[in-house]
């Protein structure tokens, strides 16, 4: 168990280093997923503040989604976070997948954000 957690932290740190190198002042789109929900937030690391956030826990989305843990929910969250970001004037971000593999729900969220107008 401890080795698994160490491997997770190594993967997460490796991805975070790559993001810092490629960011060039752009905010990052951070993804967090659980077995029941998915969360996305756009963070400005220079200022240390969250600009935009969206999750499958929001009441207006919960009624329209079958569950918060599937690919359709992730795509909807991606589109929602992109809409909110463009409303605040953020169009270019760097994608932070964390320690998650770019597959399934994480990939769907990224595709939804691209469809919503974010560039990364």
Swiss-Prot record:
Q: Does the keyword Transmembrane apply?
A: no
Q: Name one GO cellular component term.
A: ribonucleoprotein complex
Q: Encoded by which gene?
A: rplR
Please provide the record's keywords in A-Z order: Ribonucleoprotein, Ribosomal protein, RNA-binding, rRNA-binding
Pfam entry (one): Ribosomal_L18p
- Quaternary state and partners of this protein? Part of the 50S ribosomal subunit; part of the 5S rRNA/L5/L18/L25 subcomplex. Contacts the 5S and 23S rRNAs.
For this chain, the family text in UniProt reads:
Belongs to the universal ribosomal protein uL18 family.
Q: What does this protein do?
A: This is one of the proteins that bind and probably mediate the attachment of the 5S RNA into the large ribosomal subunit, where it forms part of the central protuberance.
| Name recorded for this polypeptide | Large ribosomal subunit protein uL18
User: Which portions of this protein are annotated as coiled-coil regions?
Assistant: none
The answer to keyword Ribosomal protein applying to this record is yes
Q: Which InterPro entries match?
A: Ribosomal_uL18_bac-type (IPR004389), Ribosomal_uL18_bac/euk (IPR005484)
What is the top-level taxon of the source organism?
Bacteria
Instruction: Give any single GO term for biological process.
Output: translation
The GO molecular function terms of this record are:
5S rRNA binding; structural constituent of ribosome
User: What does UniProt list as this organism's lineage?
Assistant: Bacteria, Pseudomonadati, Pseudomonadota, Alphaproteobacteria, Hyphomicrobiales
